C-alpha cells in the first residue's frame, strides 16, 4: 500500500481515484498531478514503480497544500473571521449557517438536534 502525504492509498484502484483519498485533492487536482508526472490515468496504484510514487509525492509536496496544512489554514481562516467580529465570524461562533441559508425551518445539520420546548404542542 503506497503512502502519500501521510495517507495510505488503496492499491487496487486507479491512480486518479486513489489520489482523491488525500484531503485537498479532488478530481481536477488528481488528473493534473497525473499529467505533470506523466502517468496514464488508467494505471493502477499497485502497478506504479517506487520512482513514480516518489515523483507523485514530491509533486504534491511542492505544488499543493494538503492534509494537515490545509486543515490548519481553514481553521485559522475561520478563527480570523471570528476574531474580527465579522458577520460570517459571528455565524460561525453561534453554529448557524454562514452563507445566507434560511434558519426558520431546516438548518438542523448546522444547529444540531432540535431542542424540546415545554408546552409547545400542535
Swiss-Prot record:
InterPro entries listed in its UniProt record: Rbsml_uS13_C (IPR027437), Ribosomal_uS13 (IPR001892), Ribosomal_uS13-like_H2TH (IPR010979), Ribosomal_uS13_bac-type (IPR019980), Ribosomal_uS13_CS (IPR018269)
GO MF annotation: an example: tRNA binding
Region (Disordered): 97-122
Database matches in NCBIfam families: uS13_bact
The protein's role, per its UniProt record: Located at the top of the head of the 30S subunit, it contacts several helices of the 16S rRNA. In the 70S ribosome it contacts the 23S rRNA (bridge B1a) and protein L5 of the 50S subunit (bridge B1b), connecting the 2 subunits; these bridges are implicated in subunit movement. Contacts the tRNAs in the A and P-sites.
Family: Belongs to the universal ribosomal protein uS13 family.
Protein name: Small ribosomal subunit protein uS13
Organism: Rhizobium rhizogenes (strain K84 / ATCC BAA-868) (Agrobacterium radiobacter)
Gene: rpsM
